[in-house]
């Protein structure tokens, strides 16, 4: 075994010694399994892979559920990208400066949200919208900055807020 290979193996061994040891996680070598029932954080969010749950250093991955007639909080993630895959249902996402743009996101759609871009998911449909959300922020909600709802979206104030993202 060459010097480079030995160095790589020793770095992996070192990393494995630092692997998370929480009792609610199963570890298999360098893999961590987070059972979805273990991560539920109220209505709307099943916490998955985060720095807290898996020791993730560069991403988080969660399942977001928005029941019919509900919305999220208008917010942005300071310095972190977001990628969303809609599994089922449909949402309208208000985004951009002043939340002036509206995009309908359907099951099977992917959506990319650049760092610092305000966004607001709304479910006006009749089924729960379910999406897988990945962010380049391993601390889950640490970088979330809530913004005011603009006047042109005042009708959304009557919709209950879902605890999410």
Which residues does each PLM region occupy?
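A short hydrophobic beta-strand segment most commonly corresponding to one strand
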Residues: 61-64, 83, 112, 127-145
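Residue-level recognition of conserved beta-strand positions in structured domain cores
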Residues: 63, 76, 87, 95-97, ...
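Structural motif
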Residues: 90-92, 118, 128
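Histidine-centered catalytic micro-motifs
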Residues: 72-79, 117
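Short, charged/polar surface micro-motifs in flexible loops or helix N-caps
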Residues: 54-58, 66-71, 88-92, 140
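Conserved metal-binding segment of the jelly-roll/cupin
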Residues: 66-69, 105-125, 134-136
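A short, N-terminal "cap"/entry segment at the start of jelly-roll beta-barrel domains
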Residues: 1-58, 73, 146-165
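A short beta-strand-loop-beta hairpin characteristic of the jelly-roll/cupin
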Residues: 71, 80-107
